């Protein structure tokens, strides 16, 4: 668990997550290692992708289709699936505007998915 930065948005408190938070969460998962491709961070479990930085705000997270559909329904402001990922087991998380708990859950689910392949 991490302590998010709290900001005021539209008169309400909202938590922010950044790539440092993602790094702390992902690297705390057994077997997950950080690497960089073309200057962008990625986290892998035994070589299998858990999550990858798209830019400073967006993170692509591995997710099976059922979990992805559930997260899209429950957290439409946090997760999306661009056209290029529709056929892939991936979901994009909005770190700056998304639900931090849901993103944390998605990272852990991605790790569990990759561990299940062992």
Where on the chain are the PLM-derived regions?
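Charge-dense, helix-prone N-terminal extensions
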Residues: 1-118
